[in-house]
Amino acid sequence: QHEKLFLAGDAAHIVPPTGAKGMNVAIADVEILAAALERFYASGDESGLKSYSEECLRRVWRVQHFSFFMTSMLHRPANQDPFEAQLQRAQLEYVCSSEAAARSLAENYVGLDRV
């Protein structure tokens, strides 16, 4: 957001999320902005417009973290050393064997409610 200019979706996000999350984030942005605009034009209440960026950024950073997590867990860089490879393998094994980790992965993959 810059003054009265509001960005949403890919226009607002520097790094696109992986794992088919881009459209979900864009829709969430627009949903929040639409509700804020509706309140503003119905009653003059600017609170939703003022909190738009902060509200969206909380979700965006969680999505970016999840994208980073998935990418670093599932893709091997060409210059990966054996220590990093073992850390990556341990993370994948943890996600595959822990109910708590699986639940967290599912929550982040399927979607985040307003954070």
Model segments located where?
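C-terminal helical "tail/cap" subdomain of flavin- and related membrane-associated enzymes
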Residues: 20, 35-115
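FAD/FMN-dependent oxidoreductases across multiple families
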Residues: 1-22, 44
